[in-house]
């Protein structure tokens, strides 16, 4: 309530006003009751004026029948998939393994240093929600401990073919679900290690022969009151133009010498096309579709080398808010990231400490070795 001082006029002045106001409709202040005509200042309460608020019509998003927004991309997909857990497939990124099949169907793709040897060769991990539509994905290779931890934050079933003994304690964890080997072999004229692919029916057979649930289980940390949540998606298209520290980001060169990995912004599609070995990545299993991403997340990450053979693990469990970048629509902003537990999602924050939102679409994530962070180029 507001208060105001009301100056009570002398009886003579009041009488003159009343006489002058005869015959006219006047608004009267309900708080102005004259009990004394002497001149004094009195505190009285004035009722707040409540203005009629214009009722704003909230725009309700029209939900296509039988569809829901994917927790991996925020794109509309079949509602029957809502509770289905994704798979995370290890894909060989050696030049001999090219071309890759099925990567354009992945929702999230990780690129990680697979070894400190051989020019820090990378391996890809493709996270796929609608794995039932896979016709051919791969070629499939071995996993590393880091991949087990990253797959766990999606509650994804890791698909691989073996790996060094360093993976054993991670695979033994109750939260770990994985299928190792036994996928189809394709006669492609290459050495045997480049011939294994996840093909139609493989995953159904694997699930049928296992005790793993096809649906999210109790180890999934991404469930909230609105459903399954991992990334925070923006309701509107983000441009980053108004964000602190924004820089132009149309070309990204990653410090992986063997693969010469890069991302180039495509003005027509408004996405980042992936390149390796100086060539644009295409998927012959999907009409030579370009592997392209709406979002790019780069994480500065320390690592531990196990032995002289180059086997290593990223220290991806880190609560110290390490550096990173988020890229979309040709711009980049500095961010920090944390992952506080094996099954916890990696969270990304802006320079004010707020969790970032990202655009609807596919996402590329790379853990960049901390000793090579200075060699990361964003232009």
Predicted segments, located by residue:
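C-terminal motif of bacterial Sec signal peptides marking the signal peptidase cleavage site
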Residues: 18-21
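A surface/extracellular/periplasmic glyco- and lipid-processing/surface-interacting theme
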Residues: 52, 58-110, 117-379
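Intrinsically disordered, low-complexity repeat segments enriched in small/polar residues
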Residues: 5-7, 44, 57-60
């Amino acid at each position: 309530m507001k208060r105001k001082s009301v100056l009570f006029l002398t009886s003579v002045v009041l009488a003159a006003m009343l006489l002058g106001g005869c015959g006219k409709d006047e608004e009267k202040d309900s708080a102005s009751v004259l009990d004394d005509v002497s001149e004094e200042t009195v505190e009285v309460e004035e009722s707040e004026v409540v203005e009629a608020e214009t009722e704003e019509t909230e725009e309700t998003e029209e939900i296509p029948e039988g569809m829901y927004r994917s927790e991996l991309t925020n794109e509309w997909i079949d509602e029957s998939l809502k509770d289905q857990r994704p798979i995370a497939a290890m894909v060989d990124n050696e030049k001999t393994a090219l071309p890759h099949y099925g990567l354009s169907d992945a929702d999230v793709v990780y690129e990680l240093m697979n070894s400190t040897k051989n020019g820090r060769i990378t391996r890809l991990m493709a996270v796929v929600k609608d794995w039932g539509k896979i016709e051919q994905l791969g070629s499939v290779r071995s996993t590393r401990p880091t991949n087990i931890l990253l797959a766990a934050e999606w509650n994804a079933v890791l698909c691989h073919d073996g790996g060094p003994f360093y993976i054993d304690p991670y695979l033994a964890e109750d939260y770990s679900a994985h299928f190792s080997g036994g996928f189809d072999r394709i006669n492609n004229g290459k050495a045997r290690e480049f011939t294994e692919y996840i093909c139609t029916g493989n995953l159904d057979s694997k699930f049928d022969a296992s005790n793993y649930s096809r649906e999210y289980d109790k180890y999934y940390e991404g469930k909230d009151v609105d459903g399954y949540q991992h990334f925070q998606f923006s309701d509107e298209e983000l441009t980053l133009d108004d964000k602190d520290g924004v820089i132009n980001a149309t070309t990204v060169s990653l410090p992986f010498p063997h693969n010469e990995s890069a991302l180039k912004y495509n003005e027509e599609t408004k996405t980042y096309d992936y390149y390796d070995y100086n060539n644009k990545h295409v998927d012959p299993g999907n009409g030579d579709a370009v592997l392209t991403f709406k979002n790019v997340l780069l994480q500065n990450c320390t690592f531990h080398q196990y032995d002289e053979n180059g086997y290593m693990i990223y220290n991806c469990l880190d609560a110290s808010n390490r550096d990173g970048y988020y890229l979309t629509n040709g711009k980049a902003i500095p961010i920090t990231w944390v992952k506080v537990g094996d099954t916890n999602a990696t969270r990304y924050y802006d320079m004010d400490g707020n969790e970032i939102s990202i655009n609807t679409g596919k996402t590329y994530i790379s853990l960049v070795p901390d000793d090579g962070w200075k060699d990361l180029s964003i232009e």
